[in-house]
């Protein structure tokens, strides 16, 4: 007998034996117990539950069991590896279904107030689990398994987390939140229609179908590496959180009133659909596409860190953040009163379609921006480098255009002006001390009338009047009038004032004794061609140095000339010039003059000590006589 045939019979026997002592009392609305249903080792398990409690049923390896239960308990079924398990639960409690490695598990359908937990292991195929109870079940599809979505028709909401290379399509129609996990290379499809919420988890390389919730809770969908996640649809007031990771595609559809967090990472696409009042937060990284659709009053913020455009919108009380990273496209669609701000960086395309109450758009750097509508708070957002933003908005917003610079420039004086000193008398106004105060009403009234008169007479050629002074003598007006250069001369101004005395009467001014003199101003200072100031200073310094050098050389030349014109007087000779004639000092009255450079002694200085044989010798007779007498 094949394992597929043995498994149902084994389950029937086991259920019949356990029916008597595992039955639990039924309750009308809720049952607080939950069992585990596990399918393992290439077996096919199809439990059918229609009772209030769930017994635990475990078929051995390579077996196929199809239990039908109509009592108040529900078993826990485990199908071994390479098995296909299909659990249908219609009691008030929730079994836990686990399909191990390389197994295919069918979904468990719950029509009671509890929700089962389904676990699909590696290379297993898991059919969707249908929940209609009030408990919460967890569906887990392990590595390389295929799990069908879990459908909830109660008040709970499932959380679907398929990891890498998995595709999860959670559909939520209950008020609690189940968690569905499909492991690596597995496909999990959990359908929950009870009041409980299963948890479905699809791990790495697995494909998980979405979990549909029609309740008020919020499921969480997590897609891991290389996984594809189908959208999660919410028909209640809760909001699911979808987090598909690397190389995954998530398309959550939301129609609840809570807060939904959608996070896609690394080449994934997430599409949330909101029909309630919830707030969606979408985060996708590395080439993901996020398309949230909003029909409620929630607020979604999309922020991408690279290669996308940024569009912030604020219109409601809740606030969420959508983050898309590295080459992702975000296309949110709003049909309610919610607001979705989207921020993108570095060259992505973001198309936002808003039917909400407030929109604020601020794209930067090569972006296409229409107007900036703002209502309530407006957040500035920056999109850099090749970003394109297209926004269609409607219903209740005010458009704020970009700031433009419009200035009322004063008359350009660079075209050339002419100044005239004007003096005249006003006969019909008395002079008093208030005309000496420029802030007085009398002063301002006369000044205003005079300016209006000149503007009427000279039209556009009159540029202004300044330095108005009033002095006594009725009222004597002394002022400086400015006209365009070359338009009027002093005589023309005087004649125009005299001819237009009737216009002066309209301003309650009776003018007489007009005197006009043209004011001559020196031409504008221009840089004259010549030596600059620093050049002149340098030239003066050089001249002083040259003069000092000339004086020095003149003094040196004079010294050289004086040295050549006079002889050399040896006052202190280096050699001894005194040579005594004899040993008696009385005969030596003075010295002898020795010319410079002469070393030869005078013949008179030589004394011979002999008998005078030398012709050059000199003998003193007195000395000789004296020595003879002795």
UniProtKB/Swiss-Prot annotation:
Q: Where is this motif: Required for interaction with AP1S2?
A: 618-621
Which residue positions does UniProt flag as site: Cleavage? 473-474
Task: Using the UniProt annotation, give the residues that carry a glycan (glycosylation sites).
Answer: 43-46, 50-51, 53, 57, 275, 302, 335, 355, 366, 432, 449, 508
The segment annotated Required for interaction with GSK3B runs over 598-605
Q: How is it modified after translation?
A: Probably both N- and extensively O-glycosylated (in repeat region). Proteolytic cleavage in the SEA domain occurs in the endoplasmic reticulum by an autoproteolytic mechanism and requires the full-length SEA domain as well as requiring a Ser, Thr or Cys residue at the P + 1 site. Ectodomain shedding is mediated by ADAM17 in uterine epithelial cells.
The residue ranges flagged as biased composition, category Low complexity, are: 30-46, 63-75, 152-180, 276-305
Motif Interaction with GRB2 is found at 578-581
Residues spanning the membrane: 536-556
Judging by the UniProt lineage, the source's domain of life is Eukaryota
Xref: PANTHER family: MUCIN-1, MUCIN-1-RELATED
The name this protein goes by in its record = Mucin-1
Gene source species: Mus musculus
